[in-house]
Design a protein with these regions (language model features):
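PLP-dependent amino-acid enzyme catalytic core
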Residues: 1-313
Length: 313
């Protein structure tokens, strides 16, 4: 089973459900106070997709957006935010460095932050964003009818997507939730390390992954509270094989039609294939020929140039 988010609102990823919704909520509150939303500036840090959602939401709400990106965000993802009217600021360093710069600038200029990660004292907006993400779970439950997945593989950066999916599924299925499996990059496995240590554990990212949306070294506080008791297993994967899986999706090898699967979308199938070829992991995950595995296709070709390079066309 594959939940395809490649066409969501024309923005190419699930992020369209969260950031834009949070911006709309902020703008509405601003207007209730008798203020002109044209004078509102929202700020965020991003690897690309979340910033695009915030930029789009700001454009729709008639406000401004200030987007902080790190050194390894592609030029194409930067351009996608700029054409929506965002003022994009590139910071040296990784995602955590861009988030620190965003926090500093927001405090100095009194800008509300629209972040999909949470920290001490900052929870309301990330909860709104996760509420937006929960639409995916409602759609999954509705489309599956009486059937339910035995395993769900969740790509994880800071954990907002995974938490937004798991919470409604837990409400619906409770004890029949099935196995919830996180997949991260080897370079930024903050959830795997945090679960292993029993507490949130920061990863100092030394090398960037091809799966840009997974390049986050610190778990979201709210996501941690939801995922710590609900994740059954954590996996981390290398970049090798991601391009090949994207090619297979594009060629229609996993169904009747071609699927536009971005780098992060390939991570779930990569994890499943690793398990399939490793009897020990297969047994640990309690997989068998009757398993019904749900993969989350988080994005399409959000960087069209890179996508074409990776699929070879």
């Amino acid at each position: 089973l594959y939940k395809d988010e490649s066409t969501r609102f024309g923005l190419g990823s699930f992020k369209a459900l969260g950031g834009a919704y949070a911006v709309a909520t902020l703008a509405k509150e601003y207007q209730k106070e008798g203020k002109d939303s044209a004078n509102l500036t929202v700020a965020t840090a991003t690897d690309g997709n979340h910033g695009r959602s915030v930029s789009w939401g700001a454009k729709l709400a008639g406000c401004k957006s200030k987007i902080f990106i790190h050194a390894n965000v592609s030029q194409e993802r930067e351009r996608a935010m700029s054409v929506l009217g965002a003022d994009v600021v590139r910071i040296n360093g990784n995602y955590e460095a861009s988030l620190a710069a965003c926090k500093e600038a927001a405090e100095l200029n009194n800008w509300p932050i629209v972040s999909d990660t949470s920290w001490k004292g900052y929870r309301e907006t990330p909860m709104q964003i996760m509420a937006g993400y929960s639409v995916m779970s409602r759609e999954i439950i509705e489309q599956m009818g009486s059937s339910r997945p035995s395993h769900t593989i969740l790509p994880i950066g800071v954990g907002g997507l995974a938490a937004g999916i798991v919470a409604p599924m837990w409400e619906d299925m409770n004890a029949n939730l099935g196995k919830m499996i996180s997949v991260e990059s080897h370079f930024s496995q903050c959830f795997l390390n945090s679960i292993s240590n029993g507490k949130p554990t920061l990863v100092d990212i030394k090398e960037e992954t091809l799966m840009a949306g997974l390049s986050c070294g610190e778990v979201s506080e709210i996501a941690w509270e939801i995922l710590k008791p609900t994740l059954s297993h954590c996996m981390s994967i290398a970049d090798e094989g991601i391009a090949k899986i994207m090619q297979l999706f594009a060629n229609g090898d996993f169904g009747e039609t071609s699927i536009e699967a971005g780098e992060c979308s390939a991570s779930g199938l990569a994890a499943l294939l690793i398990a399939k070829n490793n009897p020990s992991i297969w047994r640990q995950l309690e997989l068998n020929k009757d398993s019904k595995v749900l993969l989350i296709g988080t994005e399409g070709a959000t960087d069209p140039i890179l996508y074409k390079q990776l699929i070879g066309s």
